[in-house]
Amino acid sequence: AVTYNVLKDWDVETIIAKLEEAGTFEGVELRTTHAHRVEPDISAEERTRVRRRFERSKIRLVCFGTTCEFHSPDAAVRKQQVETGRKFVDLAHDTGALGIKVRPNALPKEVPPETTIRHIAESMRELADYGAGRGIEIWLEVHGRDTSDPKICAEIVRQAKHEYAGLCWNSNPGPQEVVNGSVKASFELLRPWIKHVHINELANDYPWRELFTLLRQARYDRYTMMEAQESKEPERFLRWYRALWRELNRP
């Protein structure tokens, strides 16, 4: 589960307790700025405490959902975003996570698209180099105006060309991803780089059964992370979500 947004008001203890109680949930992505307060400014002692708490639980701390983005035409802005990303890499290493999620958010109109793609790829490669030294992967979310096009994301990771640079499939319902009711073409395009998966409400027209089948066929053995809007009854929502996920996942 992603703490965005059902779990956003819970601290670490509550997140672990509620996910264990709901059953089926095995991992969590801690989105920055949420109530868990596991951020790059916490102390070494607190990092150790967080790591040990997750290690004692049934819930894996999978990654940190950052808002680092590298599409700005301004090199100084991109440099600062990479530096923020490094801090999250250190946090992920110290707390036992697998990776961090970053994102593109747009193709600025004042520069050619190929320039922005190159900027994002260069920043990804730089951050992946840093992550490799700490065993932390960098996952680019298929996200943002124009940049959520699977073809754009594929080109970014091709140019980044780094073992520690991968993609976070984001289950976007738009026509760039879903073609004639199917995500097969988009999935096959991005398949070599998919390291992390976001799924959303499930109760919509997105081809969930097909996606889960494609993931099984690809031997994807990581997590499909619930990313849903907040609920006034979060515990009830988790139980409902668990049941729907199980049904849609049936072979």
Identify what each model region corresponds to.
Residues V2-Y4, E29-R31, V62-T67, K101-R103, ...:
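A cross-family glycoside hydrolase active-site/sugar-binding cleft signature
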Residues S43-E46, D74-V77, Q81, P113-T116, ...:
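Residue-level preference for long, well-ordered alpha-helices that form the structural scaffold
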Residues E39-R53:
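Glycine-rich, positively charged N-terminal anion/phosphate-binding segment
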Residues E26-R37:
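A short beta-strand-loop structural module common to alpha/beta enzyme folds
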Residues T33-A35, E69, L107, D146, ...:
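Positions that flank functional sites
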Residues D11-E20, R51-C63, F70-W169, Q176:
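Active-site acidic/histidine proton-transfer and metal-coordination neighborhood
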Residues N5-V6, E39-P40, R78, I117, ...:
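A generic secondary-structure micro-motif detector
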Residues T3, L7-E26, T147-P251:
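Histidine-acidic metal/acid-base catalytic patches
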